[in-house]
């Protein structure tokens, strides 16, 4: 695996993209730990997935810098290869589909993102018990896609439902809960509910200041969101 990780990091460097080595390591480690496909396919699936994860992670960071369509097409080709090699219903297949949906969101392909996350939500309902992390992540992707399509009321309903479900399993200041609250505040602002959005941003500001510190970027974004909504 060390040899493959060196290949992954070399590919990222060659692509000239900036990515987080921690993100790569966590993704690869989780993929290796949780793979449950047939033993006969384990070797080639893990090799393909590890190499393609590096390429995908690299391209995703490129998308965030607005280099959208070139990288988006590269991701699609890479993910088709991975998904064909992964046994259906396995953790690697779910992980690859999540990355594909994320790439669609970043590239502005919201209809395709909604399709892939809707399929994922259905496929992962019974994967690890009710309200499992895979299912809630897919629901969150659906909400983001609907928000991108301007379907703010539907997105807000999804986000509020996700927050209730995550609150059953996670501490109140968990970053996933805070991120969901921030997106819900944004949806309210887009719907013209400025007062409710400002209240939510203020609550987020207090939570983030306590959890991350007063000068943390997320804390400052929450404060800026509250001030903007109050204008």
Regions found by a protein language model. Give the residues of each.
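Intrinsic-disorder-linked linear interaction elements in eukaryotic regulatory proteins
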Residues: 1-231
